[in-house]
């Protein structure tokens, strides 16, 4: 009965600082969009050119860490004393479901165009060599390497959850073995948590900024409603209201059902694209791209282009590594929670094999379709981007498929549901992280969830107002910098504690 009388509420030291920082940055941006774009370009150039190498080494070192976990002294250690909570098939399916966000649909549909129009290694734009390397680079950015880094952090969080029985809702909770309880629960831990929250807020706002134009462009195609910034703002507002209604009326089960529908619909849509786009070409292109990936892998891992300064690794590899870094803690906590009872080796292999298969299927099917449409001159992506923006170009890659109306309805529903679940997850994660006395499995206060969803929505609108991909890329890279150090500290804390307390 004592536990039932716990008083939940905001934790001021991790609620107000991120709110104030993000609020000030949004206000300064809206106040002068042109000046904001100048600052954004400067920040992007500085971080990617001066510190891009650090992100590349981080990924390589974490890959070696994955091998250490799989073949080292903890490989057969079980994460908890209970049997696995989910069957292997359900476990893999839940991993796949976590990959089917609207932001992933965004990049999967258009990424290959950028790789072949501005290719790496001094290749000619739109050349045969650029096209051969295009999908290979997608497989590199969304393949075993980043998932291996997530494996290490997932093992770390699963260890703290199920072996050490810690309640972890913020990264500072895991740092006690590394810096001591005094610092982990004091000013140092508060700073770490605030870095994490500010970065996460911008990351979620970025995802919303990518997802919203896809929905509004679908609306223009299906209903003839012109796509404007005002329409984007209205749609984001509707999502926030819908999220508030779901939370207030206890409709979270409905949100979970929507998440399942999203996963099944993703399978259906990908299968449709695979069949009608050209299954034989897709499989041949994928096979060839795996070979290209293996051939160029050493160069890709360490490519910084300091002599030619073409900008490809800064604009894409460093950006994506920052993307993975910024979502690492949130994603790893989720993957850890669904992996109770599995061994370290099972978790590491399951994540790398299962999640790589998920992202490789997405990027192979969608990227191959886009390349075919370009080669057959069915759509002119450069003109579409110049006149209408990236989202319109993505929509046209789907609208060019047979049964275009049915296809567009499917894509519209998929993007809409994916974004509803995104807003719900955003508000829940941020509210859990900024409230006190809210335990895992409990619902944080309604007003706090609504407040965070509003702020994330505002960030999405601000990024859309700035226009283009550079503000989105910069928000991710800037947010990834502090999380780079936080992720390393969580990793070191796990290693130190495991050596002391996870013995035979």
UniProtKB/Swiss-Prot annotation:
GO terms under cellular component: plasma membrane
Binding residues for (R)-carnitine 1: 142, 323-324
Keyword Transmembrane helix: yes
Signal peptide region: none
Xref: InterPro entries: BCCT_CS, BCCT_transptr, BCCT_transptr_CaiT
Spans within the Cytoplasmic topological domain: 1-12, 68-90, 152-186, 249-253, 336-349, 432-446, 491-504
Residues at which (R)-carnitine 2 binds: 327-330
Subunit structure: Homotrimer. The monomer is stable in the membrane and is fully functional, but physical contact between the protomers of a trimer may facilitate conformational alterations associated with substrate binding.
Protein name as annotated: L-carnitine/gamma-butyrobetaine antiporter
Organism annotation: Escherichia coli (strain K12)
Upper lineage: Bacteria, Pseudomonadati, Pseudomonadota, Gammaproteobacteria, Enterobacterales
């Amino acid at each position: 009965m004592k536990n039932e009388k716990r008083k939940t509420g905001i934790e001021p030291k991790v609620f107000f600082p991120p709110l104030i920082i993000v609020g000030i940055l949004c206000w300064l941006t809206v106040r002068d969009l042109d000046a904001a774009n100048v600052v954004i370009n400067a920040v992007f150039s500085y971080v990617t050119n001066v510190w891009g190498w650090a992100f590349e080494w981080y990924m390589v070192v974490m890959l070696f860490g994955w091998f250490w976990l799989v073949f080292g002294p903890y490989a057969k250690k079980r994460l908890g004393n209970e049997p696995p909570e989910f069957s292997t098939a359900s476990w893999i399916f839940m991993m796949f479901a976590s990959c089917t966000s609207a932001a992933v649909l965004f990049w999967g549909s258009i990424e290959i165009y950028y790789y072949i129009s501005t290719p790496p290694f001094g290749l000619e734009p739109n050349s045969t060599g650029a096209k051969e390397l295009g999908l290979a680079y997608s497989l590199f950015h969304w393949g075993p390497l980043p998932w291996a880094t997530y494996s290490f952090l997932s093992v770390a969080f699963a260890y703290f959850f199920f072996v050490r029985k810690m309640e972890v809702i913020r990264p500072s909770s895991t740092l006690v073995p590394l810096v001591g309880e005094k610092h982990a629960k004091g000013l140092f831990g508060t700073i770490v948590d605030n870095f994490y929250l500010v970065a996460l807020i911008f990351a979620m706002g970025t995802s919303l900024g990518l997802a919203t134009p896809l929905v509004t462009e679908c609306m223009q195609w299906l209903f003839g409603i012109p796509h404007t910034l005002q329409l984007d703002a209205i749609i984001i507002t509707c999502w926030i209201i819908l999220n508030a209604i779901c939370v207030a009326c206890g409709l979270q089960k409905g949100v979970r059902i929507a998440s399942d529908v999203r996963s099944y619909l993703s399978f259906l849509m990908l299968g449709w694209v695979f069949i009608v786009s050209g299954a034989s070409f897709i499989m041949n292109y994928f096979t060839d791209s795996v070979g290209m990936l293996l051939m160029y892998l050493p160069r890709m891992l360490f490519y910084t282009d300091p002599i030619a300064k073409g900008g490809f690794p800064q604009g894409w590899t460093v950006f994506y590594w920052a993307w993975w870094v910024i979502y690492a803690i949130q994603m790893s906590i989720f993957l850890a929670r669904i992996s109770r009872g599995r061994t370290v080796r099972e978790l590491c292999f399951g994540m790398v094999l299962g999640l790589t298969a998920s992202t490789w299927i997405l990027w192979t099917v969608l990227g191959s379709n886009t390349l075919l449409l370009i080669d057959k001159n069915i759509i002119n992506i450069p003109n579409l981007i110049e006149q209408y923006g990236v989202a319109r170009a993505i929509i046209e890659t789907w609208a060019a498929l047979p049964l275009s109306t049915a296809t567009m309805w499917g894509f519209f529903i998929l993007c809409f549901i994916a974004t509803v679940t995104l807003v719900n997850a955003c508000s829940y994660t941020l509210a859990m992280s900024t409230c006190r006395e809210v335990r895992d499995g409990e619902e944080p206060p309604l007003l706090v969830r609504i407040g965070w969803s509003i702020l994330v929505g505002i960030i999405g609108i601000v990024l859309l107002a700035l226009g283009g991909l550079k503000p989105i890329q910069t928000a991710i890279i800037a947010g990834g910098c502090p999380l780079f150090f936080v992720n390393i500290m969580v990793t070191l804390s796990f290693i130190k504690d495991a050596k002391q307390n996870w013995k035979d």
